[in-house]
């Protein structure tokens, strides 16, 4: 049942090749009608790294796998002893692995309104989080068997980095760091039929082309479909720390868009009895207007007052994980 089941890819080995195969597995699960799926972030068995969490080559693999985890339905690190993957195992503030993990942890929390609303679509309309590109771009022959990137919901194009760029290992599996200032690239295909805004920079590119995206260790290629409405939540340490009474709404222009913001009591099954609300938002690209419709429904403790901060995304404005400014 898409209402109750959650599957994961099993206790997989920590290697780049295995990580790449998990991506294809997740796409296949989605096509089989199983929307809630994840993989053990960083892999489960770190045999190829001498089971040593201090192995610098393992740090790179774990960071890249963790970045991808932000755009999985369930984000879950799970590893075999003696490897522990708490963030403090990867250094401290100022260390490249620690900082990258912290950055993407915060990003996951900021995306909660988007995630929760997408989960409602999964429940109410038999939707899916992970969407092979053929689902949204069936007329583009280049995406029919593409297993390196996917749509997350209807708005995000996600291209995980699945190659080692900044570390290497000797014959004894010891890890060594390369020069992090020598930035590597990852190939990204932008599907034909839409334009795409770089989540990190705000630059918009035309679809139907392959690009080389620079990928510093703290950047995974993420693009937002032009004509998207993205609710952006508060910075929190746990999911219910702050109410959603002051959300930012990022508008990615270039086409008409709509998004339904879903809310409920967050911690029970009362939504099955109708205890939830929805707010439909529509963007008219020609008129450059955003319409926020009246809230429908009700539930105990729902907000009586709220503020939406509207941001029209452009280079340097409404980009990445930074605080939005009007």
Question: What are the residue ranges of the model-derived segments?
Answer:
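Catalytic-domain carbohydrate-binding cleft regions of carbohydrate-active enzymes
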Residues: 1-219, 224-225
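Solvent-exposed, conformationally flexible loop/turn segments
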Residues: 208, 325-326
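Accessory, solvent-exposed terminal regions and/or long lumenal/extracellular loops of proteins
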Residues: 219-325
């Amino acid at each position: 049942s898409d209402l109750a089941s959650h599957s994961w890819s099993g206790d997989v080995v920590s290697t780049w090749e295995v990580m790449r195969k998990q991506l294809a597995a997740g796409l296949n699960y989605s096509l089989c009608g199983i929307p809630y799926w994840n993989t053990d972030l960083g892999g489960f068995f770190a045999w190829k790294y001498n089971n040593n969490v201090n192995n610098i080559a393992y740090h790179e693999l774990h960071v890249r796998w963790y970045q991808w985890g932000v755009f999985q339905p369930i984000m879950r690190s799970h590893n075999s002893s003696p490897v522990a993957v708490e963030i403090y195992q990867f250094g401290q503030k100022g260390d490249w692995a620690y900082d990258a993990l912290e950055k993407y942890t915060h990003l996951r929390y900021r995306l909660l309104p988007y995630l929760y609303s997408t989960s409602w679509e999964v429940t109410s309309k038999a939707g899916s989080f992970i969407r092979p590109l053929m689902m949204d771009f069936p007329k583009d022959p280049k995406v029919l068997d593409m297993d390196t990137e996917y749509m997350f919901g209807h708005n995000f194009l996600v291209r995980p980095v699945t190659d080692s760029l900044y570390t290497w290992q000797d014959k004894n599996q010891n890890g060594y760091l390369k020069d992090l200032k020598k930035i590597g690239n990852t190939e990204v295909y932008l599907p034909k039929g839409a334009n795409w805004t770089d989540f990190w920079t705000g630059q918009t590119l035309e679809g139907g082309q392959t690009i080389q995206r620079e990928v510093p260790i703290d950047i995974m290629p993420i693009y937002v479909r032009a004509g998207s409405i993205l609710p952006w939540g508060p910075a929190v340490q746990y999911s219910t720390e702050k109410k959603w009474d002051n959300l930012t709404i990022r508008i990615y222009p270039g086409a008409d868009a709509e998004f339904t913001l879903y809310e409920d009591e967050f911690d029970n099954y009362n939504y099955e009895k109708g205890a939830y609300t929805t707010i439909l938002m529509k963007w008219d690209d020609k008129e450059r207007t955003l319409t926020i419709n009246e809230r429908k429904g009700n539930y105990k403790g729902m907000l009586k007052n709220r503020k939406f901060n509207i941001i029209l995304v452009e280079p340097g404005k409404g980009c990445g994980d930074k605080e939005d400014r009007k």
